[in-house]
Every structure is written in structure tokens, then in C-alpha cells.
From Swiss-Prot:
N-terminal signal peptide: 1-22
Topology relative to the membrane: Lipid-anchor; GPI-anchor
Boundaries of every TR mART core domain copy: 73-268
Gene responsible for this protein: Art1
Protein name: GPI-linked NAD(P)(+)--arginine ADP-ribosyltransferase 1
Classification via Pfam families: ART
Alphabetical list of InterPro entries matching this protein: ADP-ribosyltransferase_ARG, ART
Organism: Mus musculus (Mouse)
Single GO term (MF): nucleotidyltransferase activity
Gene3D superfamilies membership: Toxin ADP-ribosyltransferase, Chain A, domain 1
Lipidation (GPI-anchor amidated serine): 290
């Protein structure tokens, strides 16, 4: 959506004010047509990083992708469009030149996934809406999230592109239409909740929204210019698990809310959920915790009970093997 000239002037002229501006403001066109929503840690977001299961997920993709095509027409159509574009670019290049050198491990599926996400189609909107809700429970992800393949491929693609990048963190800009975000205030820790498109160019980001405008210092986002349907936008894609600190915000009477974020790190609730479920269907298994590196509640309770029992018995080396969990 193109921003009217007056709105562009507002975006340029609105300065960063100290602290959160709390005031009563008059109803404007933005207030009528935009929705206000909190900017927080997005607890319902599906944030799997696939740590330790990249090879297993890659092996599972053919069957998984086929089943998701059948269940999700928007995804199937978007993928077909992107695949045609990818094959065309591989054969002939594009009006912006040939494909960029790909990092080691980058496959055709990664390129198609990035093209599908950036295409002018309903896919990216439906996908991100589903990502923001799929983490409400493990069962919801397994049984109701029909974008598992796309989520994995985008996550891995960003990891590969980021590792291939010469510089680390970078300043990007993000414009949002239809939502006025409300952070808790300076110092709060937040996540963007889905795969967030931003741009290296301030002006390009302004074209995408007039309700909230972000200035973001990201360390996990990766430039995807060479894999986008619209390379001139200089897009940087930020994964849903990157965490940020709110540096400052402003809420002018008219014009966009402005929010400035600085990268903190990453945080995930889930890890390798599809592979855990797949392995459990084929035989007995222990799932443990979704969060990598943590101990499950059942294991902790078992260890406590065994400790109490063993402490009341004479020392027996054979019993020590029971404490493994």
C-alpha cells in the first residue's frame, strides 16, 4: 500500500521522544481503521529452531510437503508459483541479474521457500497468522499447523544466509499496516511473533505501513534480496525467536506509532517437535521437554523419588544405574 505524500512527511518529521508518550489523543483516520495490539514475547508463536534435527527434518520433507499440499491450497498454489519463478531464474536469471552465490548447504527448496514467502499472494499473510498461533500448544502445532515445511525451510534458510554474511548485526526498518503495536515500555523484552519482513532502506519500509513504524537492530535477520520477488525492496527477514529490548517509543497524536528495538538474543519454547512425534509413532520414546537443554517435569520428579528411596537404603552400586533419566 502506497503512503500518501502527507503521511510520508509525517513519517520523516516525527522525532523520537523520550520514554513512552502517555496521552489522550483525538480520533484520526489511523485510529479508526487500525487495530491496537500489545507488543510482547508472543507466547503463542511457534518458535522452533530445529537444533539437532536438521538432517531428520530434511529427510522428512518430501512426505510432509506432499501431505501439506493436499491440506492447504494456499500453500500449494504459492509454492507452485514460487517454484516456477525459481526455475526461471536459475535458467535465465532475472531483470535484477543472476542468482547470488548460495552458501554451503543452501538447496533449491530454500530458494523456493523464500520466493513463496515474498510473493504478492495470500500465502505470507496466512502463514504468519498461523505461526503466531501454532505455539499455543504442541498438539495445536502437530494437528492444525499446515505450514510445517515452509516454517522449517525459512528457518534453515535464514540460518544459512546469516552464516554466509560478512557482517553481523544490522539496522533495518519495518512498516506495518493495520496494527498499532503497544509495547510495555522502554526496557521491555519482546519478540515479533512471526517471520518479520524489514528493509535496509527506510523509504522502502515506509511503503508497507502507516500505523506502526519500527527501527530495529537485528542480529538474527538475514538479507534475502537475491531470493525475493521484489529485490528492490532490500528485504531482511527476521525469525520469530529473536528477542529484542525496547529502546524507545513514541505515540504521536497523528501518524504512526514509532518503536525502536535492539537485539538481545533468542528464545524458543519448542524444538524439533515434528521429529519427536514422528519417532514416537514408530516406537517407544521419551519426548522430554520441548525447550532444548531443559529437564522435563516427569524426569525431575522421578529423580527426586529415586533419591529419597536410595538415601534410605544401604549403598548399592547397581542402583546407581536407575538414576539415569
Amino acid at each position: 500500500m502506497k503512503i500518501p505524500a502527507m503521511m510520508s512527511l509525517l513519517l520523516v518529521s516525527v522525532g523520537l521522544r523520550d520514554g513512552v508518550q502517555v496521552q489522550s489523543y483525538s480520533i484520526s483516520q489511523l485510529d479508526i481503521f487500525s487495530q491496537e495490539t500489545p507488543l510482547d514475547m508472543a507466547p503463542a508463536s511457534f518458535d522452533d529452531q530445529y537444533a539437532g534435527c536438521l538432517a531428520d527434518m530434511t529427510a522428512a520433507l518430501p512426505d510432509l510437503n506432499h501431505s501439506e499440499f493436499q491440506a492447504n491450497k494456499v500453500y500449494a498454489d504459492g509454492w507452485a508459483q514460487a517454484n516456477n519463478q525459481w526455475q526461471e531464474r536459475r535458467a535465465w536469471g532475472s531483470v535484477w541479474g543472476s542468482l547470488p552465490p548460495s552458501p554451503p548447504g543452501f538447496r533449491d527448496e530454500h530458494g523456493v521457500a523464500l520466493l513463496a514467502y515474498t510473493a504478492n499472494s495470500p500465502l505470507h499473510k496466512e502463514f504468519n497468522a498461523a505461526v503466531r498461533e501454532a505455539g499455543r500448544s504442541r498438539a495445536h502445532y502437530l494437528h492444525h499447523f499446515s505450514f510445517k515445511t515452509l516454517h522449517f525451510l525459512l528457518t534453515e534458510a535464514l540460518q544459512l544466509l546469516r552464516s554466509h554474511r560478512s557482517r553481523g548485526c544490522q539496522q533495518v526498518y519495518r512498516g506495518v499496516h493495520g496494527l498499532r503495536f503497544r509495547p510495555a515500555g522502554p526496557g521491555a523484552t519482546v519478540r515479533l511473533g512471526g517471520f518479520a519482513s524489514a528493509s535496509l532502506k527506510n523509504v522502502a519500509a515506509q511503503q508497507f505501513g502507516e500505523d506502526t513504524f519500527f527501527g530495529i537492530w537485528t542480529c538474527l535477520g538475514a538479507p534475502i534480496r537475491g531470493y525475493s520477488f521484489f529485490p528492490e525492496e532490500e528485504e531482511v527477514l527476521i525469525p520469530p525467536f529473536e528477542t529484542f529490548q525496547v529502546i524507545n517509543t513514541s505515540r504521536p497524536t497523528q501518524g504512526p506509532a514509532r518503536i525502536y528495538l535492539r537485539a538481545l538474543g533468542k528464545r524458543s519454547t519448542y524444538n524439533c517437535e515434528y521429529i519427536k512425534e514422528k519417532k514416537c509413532r514408530s516406537g517407544p520414546c521419551w519426548l522430554g521437554s520441548s525447550a532444548p537443554g531443559s529437564i522435563s517435569a516427569s524426569c525431575s520428579l522421578l529423580l527426586l523419588l529415586l533419591f529419597l528411596v536410595l538415601s534410605a537404603l544401604p549403598e548399592n552400586p547397581g542402583l546407581q544405574q536407575l538414576t539415569r533419566c
